[in-house]
Every structure is written in C-alpha cells, then in structure tokens.
Regions:
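Structural signature of nuclease core domains in nucleic-acid processing machines
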Residues: 1-355
Length: 355
C-alpha cells in the first residue's frame, strides 16, 4: 500500500508539463524500504530503454514517444500504386514533435467521446489541452480534423469494417491499467524467457526475426510489470460473441527521404512493420493481449480465447488519409497508418504461464 501511495503521488503530478520518470519513483520507494523489502515495478518503456538504440521517456504506466524515422521509399506492399490523396499531408503535419506533443494528443483522444458529434465541444477540449501543454492553439482545427480521421477510418475486414465511431461509448474502455506479476518458479524473468514466445505461432507477425531482437533488452526482473492500454473494445453482432481488441495510438513520424512528412503513403505495411520492430511494439502488443486475456477470463462467462480474444491494432495518428476519400475508393486494403494482427494464441498462453 505504501508503494502504491508513492506511485500515485508521482502519477498525479503534472507540473511544468514534465513526465515523471520511473527512476524518480524507485528512488523515493528505496528511501522507505530496505533492499530485502523492496518490490520493484517495471514497464515496457523501462525494458526497451535498455536497448541502446532507444531513448524513451516514461512514467509508471504510459510511454509517450514521438519517434522519427526516415525511409528510403514509399512503395506499398506488393508494389501497388497508391492513389494521389495518399500524398496529401495529414492534418498533424504542422503539429509539434516531441514527448509533450505526443502526450497532448493522447490526452485529447482519451477525453473525447467518439460518438459526440458536437464539434464545438471537441474544439473546446482540444484548446484546453493545447493550452495546458503550451502548444499553439491555432492548431486546434487541424487537430480536430485529425481526430475525425481517427474515429471515422475503416478498421478493415478483420473488424467487420467497423469504425471507432461505430462502437458504443459504454463498450469503449480507455486507459486500462494493469499489473502483471513477474515470477517464474521463484526466479527473475529474463529476456530469453520472453523471446521464446516469439518462436511460437510463426504464421503470425513478428516471429523468429523479432525473438532474436528481444535478447538485446537484457531484461531481468521480479516484482510487477505495469502498463496501460490506450483503448479496448469489442467487435461483433452480439456482445457475448464479440471479439475484443486492443488499440494503441502512436504519434511516430515516418518521413520520406525527400523530407516528406505525415504523408499516408509513408505509412505503408512495410514501413509500419519496420517501425514496430525498431521500437519493440511487438513486445508491448503481446503484453497488452496477455492483460486483456486475463481480464476477459475473469469477467466473461464461458470465455474462450479463440472466440473472444481478437488481436491488436496500432494506429499511427500522423499517417491516416482523408477518411471520406478512402471510403469513396472502396478499397479492400487496410488504410495506411493502421497495423493490425490477430491474437497469436500459443504465444499468449505461453506468456500466461510465464508471468
């Protein structure tokens, strides 16, 4: 309880627009407890910063990054030609880069009710958050247009072509916090334990190739692993038969070699997949699915993973095209800026036994 109290104190402080790092919290906790009493908290962000190629700003539960990647080309999967409107900049092209900007976007999406069609209320909310994060409020209408893309873009056939605006507010669970215990037969969980999961379900995304990358993280932890899922929601004709999905908002900037920023054509499958691997999002997504799996097992009567556990969606906010033009195109492809994968159940079962 004392540890929770300390974490809560730091979690609630939003002073000078700075995000508290977990190191600050651990130092405070260590002053209260001696080493043999201390139970540590880790997070996805604290794990990935052990990769020398990653510089993550973290707090107890959330990571707020605004990563920048430069690509060589913008060819779509299977070398398909992209329509002209995929070269129209996303409304967030003028939005600031950096951690504070990423935090601001997350807070706006968190607070906004997707089915609220009152544009003035949305503008007021956006201006409030822009002011709080000390960002130019003249960008409010651009941010509003970006939010409308987020909630109105089709999520593809795997999700019955649903849009976020189609999901009733009462079924949208935002900012779902979780804690996973880290104990495997009384010893620390390490990178090798976790990497073994990605040798399973090789027909799914991020298999052996990614498994070998996890060992770079040098994970060695006991205690608790804490995280927060941006959004969880069901898709199906009946709630009891619905599949549940996790969705994570990413404000990463994928820039073309010609300095083209925030163009949907830059956010194709291959580029998003590379971005996922680079920042260890596969690890994050599998931890999210494990947390969702345990929640559904606890809360759903007659829960069956193959029936109810849907998968994960990574939505790159700066890569979404105009939703009206995309809908008119009647494209059967997934929109740029959306990366989707069904739940790899063997991997989730492995992690469920490990954690």
């Amino acid at each position: 309880e004392k540890i929770k109290e300390i974490f809560s104190k730091f979690q609630n402080k939003r002073l000078n627009n700075n995000l508290w790092k977990i190191d600050n919290v651990n130092k405070k906790v260590s002053n209260v407890f001696n080493s043999d009493q201390f139970i540590s908290y880790s997070s996805y962000s604290s794990w990935i910063r052990k990769d020398k190629n990653i510089d993550a700003v973290i707090n107890q539960y959330k990571d707020y990054e605004d990563n920048i990647s430069i690509i060589k080309d913008s060819n779509f999967k299977n070398s398909k030609n992209y329509p002209n409107y995929f070269s129209y900049p996303n409304p967030l092209s003028e939005f600031p880069k950096g951690t504070i900007a990423g935090t601001c976007l997350h807070k706006i999406i968190e607070r906004f009710e997707f089915r609220n069609d009152n544009n003035q209320e949305l503008i007021d909310l956006i201006i409030e958050e822009l002011n709080f994060h000390q960002i130019d409020t003249s960008l409010a209408f651009k941010v509003k247009d970006a939010i409308l893309r987020i909630i109105n873009i089709s999520l593809g056939r795997e999700l019955q072509n649903k849009k976020l605006v189609d999901i009733p507010n009462e079924y949208l669970i935002k900012e779902l916090k979780y804690d996973l215990t880290l104990s495997y037969e009384g010893r620390n969980i390490n990178s090798n334990d976790i990497s073994n999961c990605f040798f399973l379900d090789q027909e799914y995304e991020f298999g052996e190739e990614y498994a070998n990358k996890i060992n770079d993280l040098q994970i060695m932890n006991k205690g608790f692993h804490s995280g927060c899922i941006d959004c969880v929601f069901p898709v199906g004709n009946k709630l009891e038969d619905s599949k549940w999905w996790v969705i994570d908002w990413k404000s990463n900037l994928i820039s073309g070699s010609d300095n083209s920023d925030c163009l949907p054509r830059n956010y194709n499958y291959e580029n998003m997949r590379n971005e996922m691997i680079k920042h260890h999002y596969p690890l994050q997504s599998h931890l999210y699915l494990l947390a969702l799996h345990r929640l559904l097992k606890w809360r759903l009567k007659n829960y069956q993973p193959h029936k109810h556990l849907g998968g994960y969606i990574y939505l790159f906010l700066k890569g979404l095209p105009d939703f009206e033009l995309f809908e008119k195109s009647k494209s059967e492809d997934i929109s740029p800026g959306i990366f989707i994968s069904k739940a790899p159940l063997k991997r989730i079962n492995y992690l469920d036994n490990l954690f």
